[in-house]
Amino acid sequence: MKNKNISLCVIAAALLMGKSVKATDFVIVKDNTVIANQACLTAAYKTNRPPVKKRLFTSKAVETEILRVKKLLTNQKLAWMFENCFPNTLETTVHYRTTDGKPDTFVYTGDIHAMWLRDSGAQVWPYIQLAHKDPELKKMLEGVIRRQFKCINIDPYANAFNDGAKGGDWMSDLTDMKPELHERKWEIDSLCYPLRLAYQYWKETGDASVFDSEWIQAITNILKTFKEQQRKGRVDYYKFQRKTERALDTLNNNGLGAPVNPVGLIVSCFRPSDDATTLQFLVPSNFFAVSSLRKAAEILTTVNQNTNLAQQCTDLAEEVETALQKYATYNHPKYGTIYAFEVDGFGNHLLMDDANVPSLLAMAYLGDVDINNPIYQNTRRFVWSKDNPYFFKGKAGEGIGGPHIGYDMIWPMSIMMKAFTSQDDEEIKDCVKMLIDTDAGTGFMHESFHKDDPANFTRAWFAWQNTLFGELILKLVNEGKTDLLNSIQ
């Protein structure tokens, strides 16, 4: 991923937040990574939201929720951060319009002006629960779903798209690039997030109008792509190479990646971090595919009465689930039976976790496994320990990172996932306090921060993590944990 004029983007984001920032930036060429080494604090807790006239989208229902939650929270910094973070996707990344008489919403990931299927599906997710209270919000969400289906039908192998046939920074990649694509990294979860979003939108609003011919084409393409990437026959439906200094931005073996044994699992050439997989059966993403396919089958049966496609979804979900039970576990000497992060069907296992969702830690958050599943609980203990090579602990906090940013950089997303999947109030409290204490005084979440210095962080404007933080706080309030939040000092 390339972000031109990246230092200017950081400055612009800082101005958008109403902050004065001095920073020395470390830039990785053709990557979105910026490490800002110092952020200056402003007085008190003045809102860092854009001025009302500069907000891209405003929802009355969201504003009502912000006021409600702020009144309940006595921790002023937490209330301030919630107000900054929860509407961040709406106010800074949502480009809503009407195309051919139907809602159409293009969602930037933040500092990169492209739409990731994963990020966009996660960014607007917490607003679905409010859609029945706000017709305009409902239309905006409908527009995201329709845009995602269109993107899938342009190319189901792509992870990120342009707003129009503009071309972009990665047109020279050795893969079947198109001008509509920002990037063409094959990641299973890119096709799962739209299914998760559309299903929940339907359940919350009762609106089935999005499941039209575009939807049928999209789910047909999703099934075709998943089956191709089981690699039971041809292995070259998808190839990817890039001239780069980052080993995880390209695939070995002439663009095919490491070999797999066709045991029923689905290849994911890249992770949700956009880094290449080591062993190409990415376990959390295969679990996500199972739950997403079952949601699609329910839609196809109930709304479309398309029993043929529904059965294909169900059959594939069962095949992948059976293969996961057989090949995705590992008998760890310390933790017992756990899920591996990646496998290849030949008996090899990669034992680690990455912060990006879907992750092993996040499987219970996504609903892919039961939170009380003993294998999941063993895995959860493993990934939040020094036995996970990408778990870092320092003076500022502890959590999971990944090779996308590298050593000692903790992703707040992992701390949020620990809180989302926790059944222990003290653990939840510790996670929220850590998130409050590692914002570097900005009032926002960042992509990652250094384990010993939260002012050393990457990406000043990363809407997914901001909205996810808002989702977490809203969930805790709605579950009656306001007193727990207010006990945080």
Please give the residue ranges for each predicted region.
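Bacterial Sec-dependent N-terminal signal peptides
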Residues: 1-25
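Low-complexity, Ser/Thr/Pro/Gly-enriched N-terminal "stalk/linker" regions
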Residues: 25-118
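Acidic, low-complexity proline/glycine-rich segments
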Residues: 37-51, 249-265, 487
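Well-ordered alpha-helical scaffold segments within catalytic/enzyme domains
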Residues: 61-74, 122-135, 193-208, 287-306, ...
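Extended, well-ordered alpha-helical scaffold segments
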Residues: 81, 135-151, 207-227, 296, ...
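Aromatic-rich carbohydrate-recognition surfaces in CAZymes
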Residues: 113-141, 145-248, 463-477
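Extended ligand-binding clefts on enzyme/binding-domain cores
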Residues: 117, 153-157, 161-164, 170-179, ...
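C-terminal capping/lid segments that line or modulate ligand- or cofactor-binding pockets
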Residues: 173-179, 184-187, 350-370, 408-489
